Amino acid sequence: MKSVFVSGSISIKTLPSEVIKSFDKIISQNIQVYVGDADGIDILTQNYLASKSYTNVTVCTIKEHPRNQASNLFNISRVNYDETLKSHREQQTFKDIYMTNNTDYSFVIWDGKSKGSFSNIKRAFKENKKLKIYYMSIDRCLLKEELTPSSIENIYKSNTGYTPSEIVAKIKTSNIYTNISKVSELKEWFINHKIFKQTQNKLEIDSKYKDYFIVENYRGSQSIKYKKGVLELINENSIFGQRA
């Protein structure tokens, strides 16, 4: 019997029509569905399959009882994990690995930025599983030619950004003419080019360049991630010197 691991982002609140059509095909072919017990896509998938009285479903959990279970007729599989791990995300990864390894293909409904879904996609590539990805931002499934590790990486990083150390690493392996070799020099470069302005414990970004960055503020702390276009910005200004 064919089987599919359905996963996706917790941020998603409703099932897109194209995803529903895919679920209907799964039902018509009596494909066994493996799904987790989280909010978001997990419970949306469970609810839809339960509404169709489809019970060829296995809900996987690391808990004694699933956090979400839409039907008492669903099978339950309790997955063991390393109990010494304190990170909830790392604990849940054991469940995702189990579902990837025990199914024929993966169907991921993704917002483009959830790390768990990104990891499931990468794992499917690594294990040579058949893969289908519905990308919410473009309201469709990715085409065959778009299903490559590099394309998925670009989608993820365009939504979540690169860390300063990742940008420095890319500069080092590029043809960009610059003396940036560490994170502190990257920050200094942006300040010198008047793209960043240091104000007390925060950095302000010139409004003309806001689209190059992703700013996150959490509990009074600021973090800045960089979009890929930052490399072009550095390249242009490194070649022609500082802006007047």
Regions found by a protein language model. Give the residues of each.
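Positively charged, aromatic-accented nucleic-acid-binding surfaces
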Residues: 154-166, 170-180, 184-244
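Short, Lys/Arg-enriched, disordered terminal segments
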Residues: 1-2, 147, 242-244
